[in-house]
Structures are given as C-alpha cells and as structure tokens.
Amino acid sequence: MTSQIVRKHLTVLGGGLAGCEAAWQAVERGLNVVLLEMCSYKSTDMDRTGDLAEMVCSNSLCSLLPDRAGGVLKREFERLGSLLMACAWKIAVSAGAVLVVDRERFTRAVM
C-alpha cells in the first residue's frame, strides 16, 4: 500500500475580486490559504486604498438581466455560495438593471 501525503494548502496571488473569492471558497472547503496582494506594498493607478476586493467603479458588477453575461454569471456565483455576491447584495444601491455597490462598504464587507 502506498501512503500519500495530502497537503491542504493554497497560495492565492492577488486580492482583487477573483482572488478574494477563490481564497474564501478554498477556506470554506478546508484548505489553509495564504492570500498575497501587492497593493499593500506597491500601488497602481487603479488602486485607491490598498484594501482587498477593491473595485474600480461602483457598477463593476454590471447587469442583473438574465439574458446578459453579467446576469448569468451572478446567478452562477450565487448558486456556488459566493461571498462577493452575498456582500454585494447586502449593500446594493438601487440602480435599475445594474448591480451597484458603495465601493468602500463593499471592501469592508468582504474583509
């Protein structure tokens, strides 16, 4: 019988929307996660705060319409238990057929 060592460790590079969601999903599945983000050391023109899950603009989450790519993706993320979608819905601002959030409140909710 061969013994196997299973390591439950993941390093996620980037603390943007995708990186934060990936890290959270991995933790929920029992992995030990290290999340590395460069903005705390070096900022770019797009970074305002250096915080995790920082959005470029308040409507970055786009359309809610079920026949648009953004609407389809949001439904898929919700079915997967997305942390980011749960946070976005908690602080959503009324904006018609677009999911708009207060960027600073969103970042705090994710963190």
Where are these regions (language model features)?
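N-terminal FAD cofactor-binding segment of flavoenzymes
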Residues: 18, 24-87
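Short, contiguous strand/loop micro-motifs
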Residues: 9-10, 60-61, 97-98
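Feature captures the FAD/FMN-dependent oxidoreductase FAD-binding
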Residues: 76-111
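Beta1/beta-strand and adjacent pyrophosphate-binding region of the FAD-binding site
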Residues: 3-18
